[in-house]
Amino acid sequence: MNTFVLQLDEETIQHLIQTLKEYQVQNANPYIRFAAKFKQATILIYASRKVVFQGKNASAVAQELGYKPVVHKSNQDNIKNKQDCSLIGSDEVGNGSYFGGLAVVASFVKQADHAFLKELGVDDSKNLTDVKIKQIAPLLEAKLPHKALLLSPQKYNEVVGDNKLHNAVSVKVALHNQAIFLLLQEGWQPDKIVIDAFTSPKNYQKYLKNENNRFSNPLTLEERAEGKYLAVAVSSIIARKLFLDNLDELSQKVGFNLPSGAGQQSDKIASQILKTYGELGLETTAKLHFKNTKKAYQLLKKE
């Protein structure tokens, strides 16, 4: 199967979504904001504005839509030659999912850990199944120094939104900074600190000024870092398990199978929760500022 990857600006992505709207398909991956099947190719648009074309006709479809694709290199190729020092890597999971909390993890990885990680098959958690994530995450947690933070939906809704302490970006800055700070406080001394970029360095520094717990170590924000640095991949895997466990726990509490992601299935489940519990049900299970909340109310009115 051929795979091609593009990094597009928001305006171009909106145009592509409009073009492929009638070919849209459901996708449960919380990192994917739009998915479509078009002429024997699958097109995936990630929240990071990465666009992936997959399938036998991936190249032809990409070119037909006006894009010049770049062959996607394997994550192992990306990881190679970037692991010659001790690293703290940080990543978050849940920011693209309507239901569930926001998990942020920072992990410390030494060069001596690489053989263990490669034996486990550690890679970008976006390419691992949930079953695999749940198998290897406990092994990583037991062996590697890390700090894991989970902002529950209820707490998220208290601090994120209009006229509140945080917006969707600043809250991630706060969580990443705190996770890394706590790890450094334990005495771990990395040669480099890398965060999987979710905003520009300038924007990160702007929001960082509001944080009390600061550190002087140099910090790098790098796009798709979870596919380039084992330390970030480790954090991505642990954070994914933390998010999934939280989603399972919330599902049991409300009696509905809460999906990850922010698609139509989330709208439907949200409307059922509204019908059963009122808005309080969403306040404790979902991120209210997502558009899904409005859509859920609209679905409820149609009943």
UniProtKB/Swiss-Prot annotation:
What keywords are annotated for this sequence in UniProt? Cytoplasm, Endonuclease, Hydrolase, Magnesium, Metal-binding, Nuclease
Where in the cell? Answer: Cytoplasm
Quote the InterPro entries the UniProt record gives.
Answer: RNase_HII/HIII, RNase_HII/HIII_dom, RNase_HIII, RNase_HIII_N, RNaseH-like_sf, RNaseH_sf, TBP_dom_sf
Sorted alphabetically, the Gene Ontology cellular component annotations on this record are: cytoplasm; ribonuclease H2 complex
Principal place of residence = cytoplasm
Q: What does this protein do?
A: Endonuclease that specifically degrades the RNA of RNA-DNA hybrids.
| NCBIfam families with a match to the protein in the record | rnhC (TIGR00716)
- Protein name per its UniProtKB record: Ribonuclease HIII
State the organism of origin. Streptococcus mutans serotype c (strain ATCC 700610 / UA159)
